[in-house]
Amino acid sequence: MSQLTQQIHSSDIGDILENSLNGIRPKKDDYLRLLESDDVYLMGLVAGKITRKKFGKKVSFVNNIILNYTNVCITDCKFCAFYRPPNHEESYTLTLDEIEARVKTGWDMFKIRQVLIQGGHNPKLGIEYYEDSFKMIRSKFPDVGVHGLSTSEIDMIATVEKSSTKEILSRLKDAGLQSVPGAGAEILTDSVKEIISPKKIDSDDWIRIMKESFELGLPASATMMYGHVETNNDIV
């Protein structure tokens, strides 16, 4: 019996880990047990073993920069120290030249392969601002991918343009958008979102816009912000 097997058999989450090694995905109750367990090291060992079995020892990463094009926002999320209301003395919106300069610096110094573009919900920015930015980046820096705009930003643009979010996504893709980040999800439980980000889109709209992204051939991800008012059940 290997040392890993012995550790699994003596762990309070051993049954879940053993199932995972055998290709059986955890159920919802299992996820809650994993979240509440302090056997983090063993989880890491098992996760590493599964990863090596599937992909070998190859790893990858994306060398990128985060470009916050504006901090103007009308959403007032409780956890955000970044945003400033419209006309605030510390508010800003980058010009096309400023965006180009930042991407150029990233390319010249670090040979970035991607720029993550995110900002506030600025009601003064129409879709042309984003289209011009994406087209400029893709034309002047063809080796730099455009990974941009949370679902809530996309919804904001649709509101400004009086258009559908799918139409906005389609136009942004045509302009050079290549993938959509997972921001804006926080915790996909509306009772939590109503406390920390009541002016943002709800969970159903977040999921809907992500589905629209996939339908248009735009890969997307999901992020989770935890450690505030959520419970473990909300996370699971």
Language-model features: where?
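Short hydrophobic/aromatic-rich motifs at helix boundaries and adjacent loops
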Residues: 2-4, 15-22, 73-76, 105-108, ...
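Short capping/connector residues at structural and topological boundaries
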Residues: 39, 66, 72, 78, ...
